[in-house]
Amino acid sequence: MLAQAQQKLAALDPPPLLLCQSMPQLRLLDSVDAAICCLDSINYLTRPRDVQRTFNRLHDTIAPGGSLVFDVHAVSKMEKLDGEVLLDEREDVFCLWRTRYRKNVKMLDYEVDLFRLQPDGAWERDFEEHHQRAYTVEELTAWLEEAGFTAIRTHGELKLRRANERDGRIYFSCIRK
Protein backbone atom coordinates (compact mmCIF):
# COMPACT_ATOMS: atom_id res chain seq x y z
CA MET A 1 0.00 0.00 0.00
CA LEU A 2 2.78 2.43 0.87
CA ALA A 3 4.59 1.69 -2.39
CA GLN A 4 1.45 2.55 -4.37
CA ALA A 5 0.90 5.72 -2.33
CA GLN A 6 4.54 6.73 -2.81
CA GLN A 7 4.19 6.38 -6.59
CA LYS A 8 1.07 8.54 -6.61
CA LEU A 9 2.68 11.21 -4.41
CA ALA A 10 6.12 11.25 -6.09
CA ALA A 11 5.36 14.42 -8.06
CA LEU A 12 4.86 16.49 -4.90
CA ASP A 13 7.74 18.69 -3.80
CA PRO A 14 8.80 17.83 -1.21
CA PRO A 15 7.30 14.35 -1.30
CA PRO A 16 5.49 13.40 1.91
CA LEU A 17 7.10 10.93 4.28
CA LEU A 18 5.12 7.69 4.44
CA LEU A 19 5.92 5.24 7.23
CA CYS A 20 4.97 1.76 8.30
CA GLN A 21 5.86 1.40 11.98
CA SER A 22 4.31 0.29 15.21
CA MET A 23 2.62 3.45 16.48
CA PRO A 24 3.66 3.04 20.14
CA GLN A 25 7.31 2.77 19.02
CA LEU A 26 7.22 5.57 16.42
CA ARG A 27 10.72 6.85 15.60
CA LEU A 28 11.67 9.62 13.16
CA LEU A 29 15.05 11.18 12.42
CA ASP A 30 13.66 14.72 12.52
CA SER A 31 10.62 16.44 13.95
CA VAL A 32 7.60 17.15 11.78
CA ASP A 33 5.15 20.04 11.72
CA ALA A 34 2.08 17.82 11.59
CA ALA A 35 0.97 14.22 11.86
CA ILE A 36 -2.21 12.69 10.49
CA CYS A 37 -3.47 9.32 11.64
CA CYS A 38 -6.56 8.26 9.72
CA LEU A 39 -8.99 5.42 9.10
CA ASP A 40 -9.59 4.66 12.80
CA SER A 41 -5.98 3.52 13.29
CA ILE A 42 -6.13 4.49 16.98
CA ASN A 43 -9.02 2.02 17.46
CA TYR A 44 -6.69 -0.75 16.28
CA LEU A 45 -4.56 -0.13 19.36
CA THR A 46 -6.46 -2.47 21.66
CA ARG A 47 -4.55 -1.68 24.86
CA PRO A 48 -5.06 1.76 26.43
CA ARG A 49 -1.37 1.89 27.35
CA ASP A 50 -0.48 1.63 23.65
CA VAL A 51 -2.68 4.63 22.87
CA GLN A 52 -0.95 6.59 25.64
CA ARG A 53 2.50 5.58 24.33
CA THR A 54 1.48 6.55 20.82
CA PHE A 55 0.38 10.01 21.95
CA ASN A 56 3.66 10.40 23.87
CA ARG A 57 5.71 9.36 20.81
CA LEU A 58 3.72 11.74 18.60
CA HIS A 59 4.33 14.55 21.08
CA ASP A 60 8.07 13.84 20.93
CA THR A 61 7.95 13.73 17.11
CA ILE A 62 5.84 16.82 16.35
CA ALA A 63 7.59 20.20 16.60
CA PRO A 64 6.31 22.68 19.21
CA GLY A 65 3.22 24.38 17.81
CA GLY A 66 2.68 21.53 15.35
CA SER A 67 -0.61 19.76 14.76
CA LEU A 68 -1.97 16.27 15.28
CA VAL A 69 -5.15 15.15 13.53
CA PHE A 70 -6.74 11.71 13.88
CA ASP A 71 -10.09 9.99 13.77
CA VAL A 72 -11.75 7.22 15.77
CA HIS A 73 -14.99 5.29 15.59
CA ALA A 74 -17.44 6.57 18.19
CA VAL A 75 -18.29 4.16 21.00
CA SER A 76 -21.97 4.35 20.00
CA LYS A 77 -21.16 3.31 16.43
CA MET A 78 -19.16 0.30 17.59
CA GLU A 79 -21.96 -0.75 19.96
CA LYS A 80 -24.53 -0.51 17.14
CA LEU A 81 -22.44 -2.80 14.96
CA ASP A 82 -22.88 -5.72 17.39
CA GLY A 83 -24.30 -8.73 15.59
CA GLU A 84 -24.43 -7.05 12.18
CA VAL A 85 -23.93 -8.99 8.99
CA LEU A 86 -23.19 -6.79 6.01
CA LEU A 87 -23.12 -7.83 2.38
CA ASP A 88 -21.75 -6.14 -0.69
CA GLU A 89 -22.32 -7.97 -3.94
CA ARG A 90 -21.08 -6.88 -7.34
CA GLU A 91 -20.49 -8.67 -10.59
CA ASP A 92 -16.87 -9.55 -9.78
CA VAL A 93 -16.70 -9.12 -5.98
CA PHE A 94 -18.68 -10.49 -3.07
CA CYS A 95 -17.96 -9.28 0.48
CA LEU A 96 -19.42 -10.64 3.72
CA TRP A 97 -18.70 -8.77 6.96
CA ARG A 98 -19.71 -10.14 10.41
CA THR A 99 -19.36 -8.14 13.63
CA ARG A 100 -19.47 -8.72 17.36
CA TYR A 101 -19.10 -6.06 20.06
CA ARG A 102 -17.92 -7.18 23.49
CA LYS A 103 -19.20 -4.42 25.75
CA ASN A 104 -17.34 -5.61 28.88
CA VAL A 105 -13.98 -4.95 27.18
CA LYS A 106 -15.19 -2.36 24.60
CA MET A 107 -13.91 -4.50 21.72
CA LEU A 108 -15.33 -4.78 18.23
CA ASP A 109 -14.33 -7.97 16.45
CA TYR A 110 -15.15 -8.40 12.80
CA GLU A 111 -14.47 -10.94 10.12
CA VAL A 112 -14.40 -10.15 6.44
CA ASP A 113 -14.74 -12.73 3.67
CA LEU A 114 -13.89 -11.28 0.28
CA PHE A 115 -14.50 -13.28 -2.87
CA ARG A 116 -13.02 -12.04 -6.17
CA LEU A 117 -13.90 -13.43 -9.57
CA GLN A 118 -10.77 -14.61 -11.37
CA PRO A 119 -10.24 -14.50 -15.15
CA ASP A 120 -10.72 -18.28 -15.34
CA GLY A 121 -14.19 -17.98 -13.74
CA ALA A 122 -13.15 -19.32 -10.33
CA TRP A 123 -13.75 -17.30 -7.17
CA GLU A 124 -10.74 -16.54 -4.96
CA ARG A 125 -11.45 -16.10 -1.24
CA ASP A 126 -9.56 -13.84 1.16
CA PHE A 127 -10.31 -13.77 4.88
CA GLU A 128 -9.45 -11.02 7.35
CA GLU A 129 -10.07 -10.74 11.07
CA HIS A 130 -9.98 -7.33 12.76
CA HIS A 131 -10.09 -6.19 16.38
CA GLN A 132 -10.75 -2.61 17.44
CA ARG A 133 -11.23 -1.06 20.85
CA ALA A 134 -13.68 1.73 21.59
CA TYR A 135 -12.32 4.78 23.40
CA THR A 136 -14.37 7.63 24.78
CA VAL A 137 -13.73 11.26 23.91
CA GLU A 138 -12.94 11.82 27.59
CA GLU A 139 -10.30 9.06 27.68
CA LEU A 140 -8.59 10.25 24.51
CA THR A 141 -8.70 13.90 25.60
CA ALA A 142 -7.13 13.06 28.99
CA TRP A 143 -4.35 11.04 27.34
CA LEU A 144 -3.65 13.83 24.84
CA GLU A 145 -3.39 16.35 27.68
CA GLU A 146 -1.09 14.02 29.65
CA ALA A 147 1.15 13.71 26.58
CA GLY A 148 1.40 17.51 26.29
CA PHE A 149 -1.15 18.47 23.64
CA THR A 150 -3.39 21.54 23.93
CA ALA A 151 -6.25 23.15 21.99
CA ILE A 152 -7.89 19.72 21.77
CA ARG A 153 -11.00 19.82 19.63
CA THR A 154 -13.40 17.17 18.40
CA HIS A 155 -15.20 17.47 15.11
CA GLY A 156 -18.26 15.72 13.79
CA GLU A 157 -18.35 13.28 10.95
CA LEU A 158 -17.33 15.28 7.89
CA LYS A 159 -18.62 18.49 9.48
CA LEU A 160 -16.69 21.39 10.98
CA ARG A 161 -18.70 21.35 14.17
CA ARG A 162 -18.21 19.84 17.58
CA ALA A 163 -18.75 16.07 17.65
CA ASN A 164 -21.97 14.73 19.16
CA GLU A 165 -23.55 11.36 19.98
CA ARG A 166 -24.95 10.91 16.46
CA ASP A 167 -21.52 10.96 14.84
CA GLY A 168 -20.18 7.56 13.87
CA ARG A 169 -16.67 8.89 13.43
CA ILE A 170 -15.03 11.55 15.58
CA TYR A 171 -12.14 13.67 14.37
CA PHE A 172 -9.62 15.10 16.83
CA SER A 173 -7.31 18.03 16.25
CA CYS A 174 -4.77 19.34 18.74
CA ILE A 175 -1.55 21.30 19.07
CA ARG A 176 1.73 20.16 20.58
CA LYS A 177 2.88 22.47 23.38
Question: How would you name each of these model-derived features?
Answer:
Residues 131-177:
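C-terminal lobe and adjacent flexible extensions of AdoMet/dcAdoMet transferase-like proteins
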Residues 11-28:
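Conserved SAM-binding strand-loop segment of SAM-dependent methyltransferases
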Residues 1:
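Conserved short alpha-helix immediately C-terminal to the canonical SAM/SAH-binding motif I
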Residues 69-142:
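SAM-dependent methyltransferase
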Residues 50-67:
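A short glycine-rich, Lys/Arg-flanked "PGG" loop and its adjoining helix->strand segment in the class I
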Residues 5-6:
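Conserved SAM-binding loop
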Residues 32-50:
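A short SAM/SAH-binding and catalytic strip from SAM-dependent methyltransferases
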